């Protein structure tokens, strides 16, 4: 988890910018001429709890207050200085007191219309249990994106993203769905790979097939473009806040880390030096450069509703990679980021995640993929026993084979339901973090399918996730 550094302040709560709500008779964002451009002119703080920094965003209807380390703003008395004609509605008094250990809405009135603002406190690293915190990852959606082979299948349009941000139940009500989003890719689609040993852990791809510095840069260009998938995700979360509620926890973003292919010499240069990946120090240096780029670009994006949570190591096994990973892990943690890994069942080193200094490892059961369906009892017993013995979390897996009218010749929705059954039987749904492999936008495909069989599966998967989210305070 990264704590966004501000001047003398470590921010912990979300910057949930919200424009005017349609709920309770409010308007959805002032139209031109509806209200003054600046409804709130200033804020006076009357008690002892005073912020070190304040920002009033009248356009987004958001007030952001930064409090220095050690301050618990549970009893903040403030007075709003309002434009002529603007009055208080909720609360009706001015001055008034807010408990800013949680996000607080206030409602102003002007010319017969109501306008909702959110007051958000950015809190320091504080052990008080009442202080709103960055929530840990609970349900992480895998978002494959960036390679040319994904075009037309995994574009992560606004509509596709919306299906992953919120779940629409059978009555049409929306609920918060995934709390975390992992953006990753295996290759550029043109023969350059970000992931080594994908096809055979004992015979990794030739080093000349490794993606180079230009490929690493281009994938980040795509992810962090002003109109790219992360910016679109940020917008969809903001839109959902208007329709659903203010989430208790931030939505988390995790970005994959490519593998510097062992012995690769054509990657490129750093500080004028050609990288030679037979040298551990060069593999570490390239990885550090990439992590720094992720942080820089995420900060530059200036997302309103997302927090950068961590880095995901994209290789699913440790072959030829053990020597440098712990050093990279230390660097990632020095940046207040988490380090994630998702090895497949039977992968080289799948139980060594703690030695590699990963913060969390999700084990892939790989029950969905074999041509012949594995035996349910023995397969999941082996998976769950191993994961439990190693302290690992689990991945749920479903792909296009789960679609009723797929063209692949085999309908495997029953296997997805077996995951749901096993995860419940072994307590995964109540005790573990879960990552969700969904191939190319499968949640959206199931939701929007014309076939009832697919819609039913969508509801079954999402109902499980929503129940997990409710246990952590979301709805």
Residues covered by each model-derived region:
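N-terminal catalytic cores of secreted or lumenal carbohydrate-active enzymes
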Residues: 128-285
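Aromatic-lined carbohydrate-recognition surfaces of secreted/lumenal glycan-active proteins
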Residues: 250-260, 274-290, 307-317, 329-350, ...
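Structural preference for beta-strand elements that scaffold enzyme active sites
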Residues: 137-144, 175-183, 250-256, 305-312, ...
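C-terminal motif of bacterial Sec signal peptides marking the signal peptidase cleavage site
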Residues: 16-19
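Bacterial N-terminal signal peptides that target proteins for export
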Residues: 1-8
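Well-ordered, non-membrane alpha-helical segments in soluble/globular domains
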Residues: 154-167, 205-242, 273-297, 321-330, ...
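Beta-rich interaction/scaffold domains
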Residues: 21-127
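Substrate-binding cleft of secreted/luminal carbohydrate-active enzymes
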Residues: 174, 178-179, 346, 358-373, ...
């Amino acid at each position: 988890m990264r704590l966004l550094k501000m001047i003398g302040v470590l921010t912990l709560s979300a910057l949930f910018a919200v424009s005017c709500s349609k709920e309770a008779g409010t308007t959805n964002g002032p139209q031109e001429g509806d209200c003054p451009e600046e409804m709130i002119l200033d804020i006076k703080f009357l008690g002892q709890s005073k912020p070190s920094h304040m920002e009033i965003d009248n356009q987004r209807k958001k007030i952001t207050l930064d409090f220095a380390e050690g301050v618990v703003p549970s009893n903040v008395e403030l007075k709003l200085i309002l434009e002529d004609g603007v009055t208080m509605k909720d609360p009706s008094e001015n001055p008034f007191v807010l408990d800013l250990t949680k996000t607080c809405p206030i409602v102003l009135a002007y010319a017969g219309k109501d306008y909702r603002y959110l007051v958000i406190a950015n809190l320091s690293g504080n052990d008080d249990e009442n202080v709103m915190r960055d929530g840990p990852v609970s349900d992480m959606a895998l978002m494959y994106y960036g390679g040319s082979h994904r075009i037309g299948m995994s574009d992560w349009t606004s509509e596709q993203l919306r299906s992953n941000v919120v779940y629409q139940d059978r009555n049409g009500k929306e609920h918060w769905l995934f709390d975390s989003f992992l953006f990753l890719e295996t290759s550029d689609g043109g023969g350059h790979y970000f992931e080594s040993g994908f096809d055979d852990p004992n015979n990794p791809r030739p080093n000349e097939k490794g993606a180079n510095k230009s490929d690493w840069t281009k994938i980040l260009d795509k992810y962090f473009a002003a109109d790219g998938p992360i910016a679109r995700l940020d917008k969809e979360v903001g839109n959902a806040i208007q329709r659903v509620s203010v989430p208790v926890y931030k939505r988390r973003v995790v970005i994959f880390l490519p593998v510097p292919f062992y012995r690769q010499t054509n990657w490129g240069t750093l500080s004028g030096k050609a990288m030679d990946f037979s040298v551990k120090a060069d593999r570490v240096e390239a990885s550090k450069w990439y992590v720094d780029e992720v942080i820089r670009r995420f900060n530059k994006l200036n997302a309103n509703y997302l927090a950068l949570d961590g880095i995901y190591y994209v290789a699913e096994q440790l072959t030829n990679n053990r020597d440098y990973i712990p050093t990279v892990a230390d660097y990632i943690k020095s940046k207040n980021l988490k380090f994630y890994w998702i090895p497949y069942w039977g992968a080289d080193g799948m139980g060594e995640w703690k030695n590699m200094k990963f913060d969390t490892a999700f084990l892939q059961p790989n029950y969905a993929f074999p041509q012949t369906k594995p035996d349910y009892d023995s397969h999941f017993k082996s998976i769950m026993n191993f994961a439990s013995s190693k302290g690992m979390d689990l991945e749920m897996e479903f792909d296009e084979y789960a679609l009723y009218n797929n063209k692949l010749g085999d309908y495997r929705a029953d296997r997805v339901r077996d995951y749901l059954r096993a995860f419940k039987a072994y307590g995964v749904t109540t005790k573990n973090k879960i990552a969700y492999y969904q191939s190319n936008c499968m949640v959206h495909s199931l939701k929007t399918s014309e076939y009832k069989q697919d819609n039913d599966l969508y509801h079954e998967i999402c109902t499980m996730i929503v129940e997990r989210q409710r246990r952590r305070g979301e709805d």
